């Protein structure tokens, strides 16, 4: 069974439309947005695990690199998985469930994870790689801490895709620095995802090239696309503009 066989059945047009409709709440109602994203992500990881390992995901440890406020914890717990969140920014950790008692969270950088080699079953990073200056150092750390036969799942926003500019909208096509300056003039403050400091241009090509170099890549697909549109990820050039978010699945 291929790693994506089960998830491909879930990757319908209805799912894509449902997730797209939630994106408008990212800034105004983060609990709603991230709650929906968390449920979808946990289902995706569970499907990938079951297909790749032919075992159930219950009882497996998930290390969420860049877990932020911790909205993903409950979604993984509902699937019987042991969740550990990693977040370097204390402001993010205190903005949601991560601040509640009983959670398992570690304050650390994704590019220098304080975990032993091969110590977790699944290492996940969702929409974080585009926010660090060296995303493949983060990726290498994820592979390092994942046990042999486990899964490292790295999902990130492609810069030239329609959501590459985050809250700056499509103005990122004018250039990242220019888009950030335009946002600042309009809103009176710098964007949270500020080009060059907290947002960087990460391409689909570079992600695929890095993943192939590890020798552990077993799947790559557009995260939010319906299955019938996954072919776009195989077309150089086109994928940079139409693959809004790329998922790289690695099995050390």
Swiss-Prot record:
Q: Which UniProt keywords apply?
A: Methyltransferase, Transferase
Enzyme nomenclature, EC number: 2.1.1.-
State if Lipid metabolism is listed as a keyword: no
What Pfam families does the database record attribute to this sequence? Methyltransf_11
Q: Name one GO molecular function term.
A: S-adenosylmethionine-dependent methyltransferase activity
Q: What is this protein called?
A: Uncharacterized methyltransferase Mjls_0208
> What Gene Ontology terms for biological process does this UniProt record contain?
methylation
Q: Which PANTHER family match?
A: 2-METHOXY-6-POLYPRENYL-1,4-BENZOQUINOL METHYLASE, MITOCHONDRIAL (PTHR43591:SF24), METHYLTRANSFERASE (PTHR43591)
């Amino acid at each position: 069974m291929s790693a994506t066989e089960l998830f491909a059945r879930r990757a319908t047009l209805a799912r894509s439309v449902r997730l797209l409709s939630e994106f408008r709440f990212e800034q105004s109602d983060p609990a709603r947005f991230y709650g929906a994203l968390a449920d979808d992500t946990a289902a995706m990881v569970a499907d990938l695990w079951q297909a790749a390992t032919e075992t159930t995901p219950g009882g497996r440890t998930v290390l969420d690199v860049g877990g932020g406020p911790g909205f993903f914890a409950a979604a993984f717990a509902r699937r019987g998985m042991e969740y550990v969140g990693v977040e370097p920014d204390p402001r993010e950790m205190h903005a949601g469930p991560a601040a509640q008692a009983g959670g398992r969270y570690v304050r650390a950088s994704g590019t220098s994870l304080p975990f032993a080699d091969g110590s977790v079953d699944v290492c996940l990073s969702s929409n974080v790689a585009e926010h660090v200056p060296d995303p493949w150092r983060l990726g290498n750390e994820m592979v390092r801490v994942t046990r042999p036969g486990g899964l490292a799942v790295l999902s990130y926003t492609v810069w030239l895709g329609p959501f590459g500019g985050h809250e700056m909208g499509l103005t990122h096509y004018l250039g990242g620095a220019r888009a950030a300056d335009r946002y600042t003039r309009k809103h009176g403050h710098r964007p949270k995802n500020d080009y060059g400091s907290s947002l960087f241009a990460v391409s689909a090509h570079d992600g695929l090239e890095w993943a192939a170099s590890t020798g552990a890549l077993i799947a790559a697909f557009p995260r939010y696309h319906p299955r019938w549109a996954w072919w776009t990820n195989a077309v150089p050039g086109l994928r940079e503009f139409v693959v809004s978010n790329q998922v790289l699945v690695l099995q050390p």
